[in-house]
Amino acid sequence: MTSAPTRAPTSTADIAAAVAIDPALLAILPATVDGFPVVESPEGEAAALADPILPSVGRAVAAGFAIDPAIGDFVYAVVVQLRPGALPDEAFRDWRDSFDEGACSQADGVVGHAETEIAGRTVYIGTCAGGLRTYHVLLKDRDVLISASAAGERRLGELLIENLRP
């Protein structure tokens, strides 16, 4: 008896089901940020899977979180293993806008965007009215996207991006 061949995902539901949670992606992030451990965030992964854009661009996702418990500064990062060719410039802008809107929705909205270089990588930074910042890095050679949000004077978002592992 033979089994039916596996079909490629064709519908949005099929594609969403094909996005895996892969904690191994967290190895791209530094183990610590300013001395605070980066730990997997199942809540963040669940939120990422609910993003309507993710299934069209990502094959796998992981989320990590680091916090200074004494003062509440934090960084939250989503690492996405991209589908080959799925994130051209326009789609990357859409991703950033969607991520920034979501991150800033509880911080009084997006008030600015900037582009800079950190550790030799182009980084897109969003600023929320409430002080939260977002960071986006596209590692084209690895088909990986990292989007992070951070709050606080310690600038944990910048430190996370600065210390990404090769």
Positions of the model-derived regions?
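A short, solvent-exposed beta-edge/loop patch
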Residues: 36, 109-166
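Well-ordered mid-protein domain cores that form the structural environment of catalytic cofactors
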Residues: 105-106
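Short, surface-exposed beta-edge/turn micro-motifs
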Residues: 59-60, 72-76, 133-135, 142-144
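Extracellular secreted precursors and ectodomains with disulfide-bonded cysteine-rich loops/domains
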Residues: 101-102, 126
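N-terminal "mature-domain start" segment
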Residues: 1-63, 114-118, 161-166
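A short acidic-to-branched-hydrophobic micro-motif
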Residues: 61-95
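Sec-exported extracytoplasmic/periplasmic mature domains
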Residues: 34, 83, 87, 96-101, ...
